[in-house]
UniProtKB/Swiss-Prot annotation:
InterPro entries: Asp_de-COase-like_dom_sf, Asp_decarbox. HAMAP family: PanD. Binds 1 pyruvoyl group covalently per subunit. This is Aspartate 1-decarboxylase. SUPFAM superfamilies: ADC-like (SSF50692). GO terms for biological process: alanine biosynthetic process; pantothenate biosynthetic process. Pathway: Cofactor biosynthesis; (R)-pantothenate biosynthesis; beta-alanine from L-aspartate: step 1/1. Substrate binds at T57, G73, A74, A75. The gene is panD. It catalyses: L-aspartate + H(+) = beta-alanine + CO2. Belongs to the PanD family. It comes from Clostridium botulinum (strain Alaska E43 / Type E3). GO terms for cellular component: cytosol. Is synthesized initially as an inactive proenzyme, which is activated by self-cleavage at a specific serine bond to produce a beta-subunit with a hydroxyl group at its C-terminus and an alpha-subunit with a pyruvoyl group at its N-terminus.
Length: 124
């Protein structure tokens, strides 16, 4: 059996820009996508903690260490600069591997610099 599992995520990033006139996608600081194991053009889910919106798009790498998180195209209507979002990538993993797989989780500061990188989430 193949399962859809969390591959990596960037947790509580702050949206820095929204560009309605761009073709689509999300531009993310290259340092952040590398840390989360997310690839250029990879499909991601965006969850907006401010308004509850959820959407899917693909990733465009932004300038390294710039802190850029920019929603492009129609997504700019759902997510605004200043909103706190979670960027989630999933992978299809066979069940035997899924039991031991550890996703990459990148926690960021308010300026989208990396605060912590873990390979799991622990919630007490």
């Amino acid at each position: 059996m193949i399962l859809n599992m969390l591959k990596g995520k960037i947790h509580r990033a702050t949206v820095t820009q929204a560009d309605l006139n761009y073709m689509g996608s999300i531009t993310i600081d290259k340092t952040l996508i590398d840390a989360a194991g997310i690839l250029e053009n990879e499909k991601v889910q965006i969850v907006d903690n401010n308004n509850g919106a959820r959407l899917e798009t693909y990733v465009i790498p932004g300038k390294r260490d710039s802190g850029i998180i920019c929603l492009n195209g129609a997504a700019a209507r759902l997510v605004q600069p200043g909103d706190e979002i979670i960027i989630i990538a999933y992978a299809q993993i066979i069940e035997s591997e899924a039991k031991t797989y550890k996703p990459k989780v990148v926690f960021v500061n308010d300026d989208n610099t990396i605060k912590e990188i873990t390979n799991y989430e622990f919630n007490e």
